[in-house]
Amino acid sequence: MIPPQKVFLVDDEPALLRALSRLLRAEGFEVAPFSNATDFLKAHDPDAPGCLVLDVSMPSMTGIELQQHLIEAGSNLAIIFLTGNGDIPMSVRAIKAGAVDFLTKPVKDSELIGAIRLGIKKTHENRSTQNEIASLKNRLKLLTTREQEVFLHVVKGEPNKQIASTLGTNF
């Protein structure tokens, strides 16, 4: 059985948090609502997979500031902005920084759920890619010094004879 996918909601509007929580739970998501970015950061495990649905305009820390904080912390959490007062430069900045989507309130349920599913898919793809990279780095560490020298020439695309000549061995 596949565990429920976690969606973090951060919005300072209590009525919206309740409505979105009900909607997403009905769709089978596990929901963690927060009324501000500070509470979210206190409770959030940076290694936890999932998707963050985030308001732009909030007191103390804006959604854009939270996004930047998560990027600096190395989080892979997919971010979807949901705002009532965004503008084009703000949305471009958010998307360039890695947001999956930038939606405006009111939003169709199907549009939000589709964006969340895409965000969760991207989170899993990023996690899989990071695991693959870590595995490859560990395998590289197993190479001897000489094998590492040869490897560096191979990845540059040098032919075997040139590598042998450069490293002073016979081919």
What kind of feature is each model-predicted range?
Residues I2-Q5, E13-A32:
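Two-component/phosphorelay signaling modules centered on CheY-like receiver
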Residues F8, D47-V53:
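Active-site beta3 strand of CheY-like receiver
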Residues S35-N36, M61-Q68, G86:
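Acidic catalytic/metal-coordinating carboxylates
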Residues K42, I64-N76, R93:
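Short amphipathic alpha-helix used as the core "switch/output" element in two-component signaling
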Residues D55, T83:
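Active-site residues of response regulator receiver
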Residues M58:
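Receiver (REC) domain active-site loop signature in two-component systems and cognate sites
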Residues D87-P89, L103, V107-I116, Q162:
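C-terminal output helix
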